[in-house]
UniProtKB/Swiss-Prot annotation:
HAMAP family per record: RNase_P_4 (MF_00757)
Keywords: Cytoplasm, Endonuclease, Hydrolase, Metal-binding, Nuclease, tRNA processing, Zinc
Record's subcellular location: Cytoplasm
Subunit structure: Consists of a catalytic RNA component and at least 4-5 protein subunits.
Protein name as annotated: Ribonuclease P protein component 4
Taxonomic path: Archaea, Methanobacteriati, Methanobacteriota, Thermococci, Thermococcales
Catalytically driven reaction(s): Endonucleolytic cleavage of RNA, removing 5'-extranucleotides from tRNA precursor
Length: 120
């Protein structure tokens, strides 16, 4: 029994370290992007490799900051176009200006949370 619990604890620790590394790499990519886009893209690739190896989910705040197709770090207004659309379901459209890939993220959940906050 003790081995099983220690293994779980070890896996939890590995995932925690992986998430910290992903966060550090994306913060570095954010800082470096202004003067070296290639290095920022490399940091994103390394973060994706860490995420895959550790089998952890990418945090939401970073998931939307890289292109799913070309893995480049996205900065709105520089190499990404961000638009809000209302057709059918309200969503955010992010277009990568490096490869032309379009990503859509619904924001219905955020709207519902705001409505609940207003009612209370």
């Amino acid at each position: 029994m003790s081995k099983k619990f220690s293994r779980r604890k070890e896996q939890r620790e590995k995932k925690k370290i992986a998430l910290e590394r992903i966060d550090i790499l994306f913060n570095l990519a954010e800082r470096v992007f202004a003067y070296d886009k290639e290095l920022a893209n490399r940091y994103v690739e390394i973060a994706l490799a860490v995420q895959q190896k550790a089998k952890v989910r990418m945090p939401r705040k970073w998931k939307r900051r890289y292109c799913k197709k070309c893995h480049s770090f996205l900065v709105p207004g520089v190499n990404a176009r961000v638009r809000l659309r209302q057709k059918r379901m309200p969503h955010v459209v992010i277009k990568c200006l490096e490869c032309g890939h379009i990503m859509r993220y619904p924001y219905l959940r955020e709207k519902k949370e705001r409505r609940k906050a207003k009612k209370q």
